[in-house]
């Protein structure tokens, strides 16, 4: 087959593909239109719910109610979407509807890119105002002062147990725990240097250093260990210095 014939055959295949896809895309567009109408109706009902909550002085965010909805979504899901995918979609729907009732500001231990930010978005969805704080104390102060509606802080991990500073702050303030989320955490030793022997110091949050101490003792005993405010800050510092990881 000549090159010209191959090109003609390919063009014909593309034409046939487009003929089959076109009606399916029209159907998808119609389903999208219906979804938008239904989501708008849901948002309108959420506004009505918000008015009732405001009348009775109730909180807009009810994590137990949202958890019930996500559980119900999994129960009535006929497929082919997997439950975790459908629940992720519904989390964002609820987050967007909640935002038109009241815009929540959520403080977390920053900067951006920390596990705390990840937990915040997994719990509240993306339709919130994020407030990154330099310390756990700042998170608590932001909520107490009314600058943030909620705060997200680490309270325990499976390898090192409870985070003592978080527990102290819970005892010293009148703030209460209103919800919880567990997220998997994996650490990696990263550096711009391609030779580990050239790296002199490893930076990380104190909890991360404690969690990784056995691995570091075996694989990188020569590295000095320095605690910093967050793993995200450690990554930022290491990204510009080949002697850091």
Residue map of PLM features:
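Domain-level signature for soluble enzymes in the chorismate/prephenate branch of the shikimate pathway
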Residues: 1-245
